[in-house]
Amino acid sequence: YALLDRVWNPADRIVLELPVAPRLVRAHKAARELDGMAAIAAGPLVYCIEQADNADYARLRLDTAGSMELGYRSDLMDGTPVITGTAIDGKDAKSTFTAIPYYAFGNRGNGGYRVWLPTR
């Protein structure tokens, strides 16, 4: 919580800006099965890659040297933030991925998804 103790005027405004740039999150070292993997997050949201957007989702590896960009898809659940970035596909070729918030997976038919992804 943030306490703002002052005398307020009708025209006063509060602007709160929080960083929501996409980032990679690593698991605790005690989670050995997740060694060499990372999850994608932005702000408080954890993202996943879903088969609906990434046909080769099960074999994608994150390119940790690549960039990620936060975007928006108005056609997904009446508007959803998405992250796009660079990956390596199952044939060791550069590829791109689209990640959606974990809360949004499974809304476009049956298909797999992943939260934890191998890194390059």
PLM features per residue range, with description:
Residues 2-4:
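Short strand-edge motifs at loop-to-beta-strand transitions and within beta-strands
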Residues 6, 13-120:
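C-terminal beta-rich recognition modules with glycine/proline-rich loops and embedded aromatic residues
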